[in-house]
Amino acid sequence: MARSQLERGLAIVELLFGHVLDGLENKEICRRLEESPVNICRDLDLLKKSKWVKQTPTGGWVLTERPVALLKVFQVYQQKYHERMTSYAARTDAQAQQMIR
């Protein structure tokens, strides 16, 4: 079954996450995703316009800092959520202790 452009774009991003520093050539992306060069070129162009990938001086493709920064945003959110939950647990524990007395 053929994948949609969105599915191919996400597959490219996932693939390039494993090659953040060195990137991959178009031909290698096509081979690994078993997609035609036409589709991959189209998808890479869209990802480039969206600032998710960029071309290296040697012609390969790498992720920009954007998707990596989004991952960092998620990690910061998780940390803040954990801190809030820890604070909430401490407050409810203290209130429960007062109720027991």
Enumerate the language-model features and the residues they cover.
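N-terminal helix-turn-helix
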Residues: 4-68
